[in-house]
Amino acid sequence: MYDSKKLELKWQEIWDKEGIFEPKKDYNLQKKYILSMFPYPSGRIHMGHVRNYTIGDAISRYYRMQGYNVLQPIGFDSFGMPAENAAIKHKIHPKKWTYDNIDYMTKELFRLGFSFSKNRILATSDPIYTKFEQEFFIKMFEKGLIYRKNAVVNWCEQDQTVLANEQVEDGKCWRCGNEVVQKEMPGYYLKITSYADELLSCLKDLQNHWPSQVITMQENWIGKSFGLEFDFKFDDESSKKLGGVKSFKVFTTRPDTIYGMSYAALAPEHAVVKAVLEKNLVSKETADKIKKILNQSPRERQANDKDGAFLNLFAIHPLSGKKIPVWMANFVLAEYGGGAVMAVPAHDERDFEFAHKFNLPIIQSIGAKNGENVKLPYIESGILVDSAEFSGLENEDAKMKIIEKFEKEKIGKRVTNYKLRDWGISRQRYWGAPIPMIKCPKCGLVPEKIKNLPVTLPDDIKITGKGNPLDKHPTWKHCTCPKCGAEAERETDTLDTFFDSSWYFARFTSDENMWQEKGIDEKSANYWMNVDQYIGGIEHAILHLLYARFFQKVLRDLGYLRDSEPFANLLTQGMVLKDGAKMSKSKGNVVDPDEIIEKYGADTARLFILFAAPPQKELEWNDSAVEGAYKFLNRLYERSQNVQKTREIPKIDQSSLNKAEKYARLKVYEALQKSSEVYEKTFAFNTLIAACMEALNALNAQENRQILTEGYFIILNLLDPIVPHIACELSENLFGRANFTPIKILPEVFEKDEIRLAVTVNGKKRAEIEVASDLSQSEILKIAKEQVLKWLENKKIIKEIYIKNKLVNLVVK
């Protein structure tokens, strides 16, 4: 049994001393930037981390072997609520808790032999990182990409902080699981909507480079749609009730159904609904119902049954002139299309469900093209019916003609809408990057001076879990205005942690010599960016990956970066499961990587992780399979004793080999042939490992020491990115070197002793023959004719065609 602990420590010390994983500063070299999503420093790494970083490390080591200049950095997404929760629970400062965890996790990661650049390790809570992040914030603010406004937000009472829509899951906070309520608050917003079109259009450049599922999820989240926007006018009585409000805007993607409208529906947050409540235009019972729905998050409303209330208001149909009742409905989103819809229950499932519940009219305006009766709601394409001059038109044609009518009469227009909303980035917590803004009673909102950055957090803080700790600090928020010098107050909100993780990939590119000088060194960034291979979980498809794409475009426009997309290729790895469920302490099914390393070694953990399943699939933990991986490495180590020690790899005469020797050599070269596709495209490491195992078995089944020696040299080369410690040890012992280089594929190894050929007569297959591969063409033709004699009787052969190693075709007449 080999001593994995001793062997692995030896090679980790060698790699560290030689600094071989630090990227070279020669920007003329071909480069590869391989990045796995950085972890939150929760205290210990888990098997999900091991899988993520083993995949990235295997790819990185492969490209170094191919002669590329490789950047593979690591850092920590180190701001966030868990540190504050730990401060309350364990009476420890968030900073100490965070950096203690970073120290421990860094040691764990390097115990696994990951080839990270040690000179570029960062934490987003480092003051130097905060400095440049605040500089970017100020530049975005000055460009109008960040603004402050009052808005109804998702509020978590437990964490006492604002949540982005994406952070609300089934009406609950994504972190603590508590119910989320709606609350109006001031906050800072990133104008991601100003890049909506580019974020959408650039997705086409990522086709075949990103998983299609991620692209679809982002397309749906951005939610671009075309349609008609018009002012829906109140009747005189309703306008009078509302104090002179004349109309409200409506957006619809289905103007072809406008003659089927039977009611209008407003979002609970709509200004008209607010006016109805303020002016007591509905009963107390109805008002209470509206207020109850108002306090539900948008996602909670979507999950509930359709509900609403009549507002005692009517609007006038813009084309027919009919009076249309105006309702509040829980399924209408305040953030989309102005928060108002024209409801057509005959041709929309949600409208139909609502109308059915409240006994509202259902008016059909589209029928089937074949004239047959249809079941409502009918949402397919068809022919307009009972739609004035548009009756008889196909609905797609009618859409444009109805919009043209609205535009001609100047009562509406064609518009583009997005589901994507601006990103709220204010958080009411201590452990986050301070927002570098100052509230001056004279000047208003003023950014801090760049020379005064970073604005850092006070260490003397009391964290109770209630309210904003910075707001309660006795001195920290008091300052002078950078503009006029008057007494002022700092912004006490901190940045959403997704802000921190939206540019870290660009920070990693900065040469360590420029680390303190620039947040992003343009020369280095233009060489390294974009990331050639990004690796992380699909759960980040919308949040992190969309925000990172947005930041890339903003930083490009600010002159820091050149590329429009941050990640050229994306691999989303599956979760690690045990007993069919995601590993968690509550389920008691956690496997501690430290215990696996202690018992079997890092190489065994790496081998199992890459062999157990393709990276894109879920991986089921299997103790016996871990044991099997360990046994394979022991077998590889023990049988290396039969290998000839040499600095020159044997040159082998293929023609002199027997069948077992040829087979063993073939299996080795088949694995070699597979390797480039695995490491560069498919990442199906399990298939490469299986091929190496098969090759090793074949090598051990024959007795030619030269074949064994050549085979070991190649197999160690192929396995080095996966099990680098044992591969380096054996290569040094056997071949006097541990620096692996590409190996040429020898075509003669794949030449078979016998070949199988199809025999066709006039193009029709009549037989198959197996012949020696060195047989002449005339001999092959002779054998082929003998096999198809009955199809040649009384026929004249006018042409004989031989396609080497494939077929013989006899043309007869």
Curated annotation (Swiss-Prot):
Question: Where found, per UniProt?
Answer: Cytoplasm
A Pfam family for this UniProt protein?
A: tRNA-synt_1g
Taxonomy, superkingdom: Bacteria
May I have one GO cellular component term?
Answer: cytosol
Q: Report the catalytic activity.
A: tRNA(Leu) + L-leucine + ATP = L-leucyl-tRNA(Leu) + AMP + diphosphate
Q: Where is this motif: 'KMSKS' region?
A: 582-586
Please state what class of enzyme this protein is. ligase
* Residue span of motif 'HIGH' region: 39-49
| Any one Gene Ontology BP term | leucyl-tRNA aminoacylation
Enzyme Commission number: 6.1.1.4
Q: Which GO terms describe its molecular function?
A: aminoacyl-tRNA deacylase activity; ATP binding; leucine-tRNA ligase activity
| HAMAP family for the chain | Leu_tRNA_synth_B (MF_00049_B)
Which protein family is named in the record? Belongs to the class-I aminoacyl-tRNA synthetase family.
The family database entries (PANTHER family) matched by this protein are listed as: LEUCINE--TRNA LIGASE, MITOCHONDRIAL, LEUCYL-TRNA SYNTHETASE
This chain belongs to the protein called: Leucine--tRNA ligase
Q: Which organism is it from?
A: Campylobacter hominis (strain ATCC BAA-381 / DSM 21671 / CCUG 45161 / LMG 19568 / NCTC 13146 / CH001A)
Q: Which gene produces this protein?
A: leuS
